[in-house]
């Protein structure tokens, strides 16, 4: 059984726990899977760039590369789940204020209609030089879309992003 399947079933996760409850670790896994666009089980520099911008952090390529070097302890060229957990709990846990999350939401909500649509994600991906498939975008929306209307409103976005606030 894959770790993702174990987490969905509520079994004890493998790897370092950083003092997190199983529930919080599952929530971080959900965010990790959202940003692991290619499903490789790790986040490369390109995916990290998308993740940081989505979280409201405007970072240039040099800053992304520096963050990768700092977080990628095994120097694999990508951030695995344990490294992501460490980054989220030690580096960015305290950064998820309501103002910062609202700013991130507004950046992604290109048409300013109060919802993040597949079109909004396509537009920000284009700005970032990313090329997501429609399936990738659909999966991103489904991760946060609690009312199942096909878009992510501010409340849904806040709930999803606040689940990564452990600092």
From Swiss-Prot:
Ca(2+) 4 binds at residues 145, 147, 149, 151, 156. One of its GO terms (molecular function) is calcium ion binding. It is found in: Cytoplasm; Nucleus. SMART domains: EFh. GO terms for cellular component: cytoplasm; nucleus. GO terms for biological process: DNA repair. Induction: Up-regulated by UV-C induced DNA damage, but not by DNA double-strand breaks caused by bleomycin. Expressed in leaves, roots, and at lower level in stems. Barely detectable in flower buds and flowers. Ca(2+) 1 binds at residues 36, 38, 40, 42, 47. Its main location: cytoplasm. It comes from the Eukaryota. This is Calcium-binding protein CML19. It comes from Arabidopsis thaliana.
């Amino acid at each position: 059984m894959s770790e993702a399947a174990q987490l969905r079933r509520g079994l004890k996760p493998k790897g370092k726990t950083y003092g997190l409850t199983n529930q919080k670790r599952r929530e971080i896994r959900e965010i990790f899977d959202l940003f692991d666009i290619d499903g490789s089980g790790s986040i490369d520099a390109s995916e990290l760039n998308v993740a940081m911008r989505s979280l409201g952090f405007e970072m240039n390529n040099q800053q992304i590369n520096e963050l990768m070097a700092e977080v990628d302890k095994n120097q694999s060229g990508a951030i695995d789940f344990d490294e992501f957990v460490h980054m989220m709990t030690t580096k960015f846990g305290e950064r998820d204020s309501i103002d910062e999350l609202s700013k991130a939401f507004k950046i992604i909500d290109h048409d300013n209609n109060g919802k993040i649509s597949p079109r909004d994600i396509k537009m920000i991906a284009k700005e970032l030089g990313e090329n997501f498939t429609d399936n990738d975008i659909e999966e991103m929306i489904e991760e946060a879309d609690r009312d199942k209307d096909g878009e992510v409103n501010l409340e849904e976005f806040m709930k999803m992003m606040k689940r990564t606030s452990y600092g």
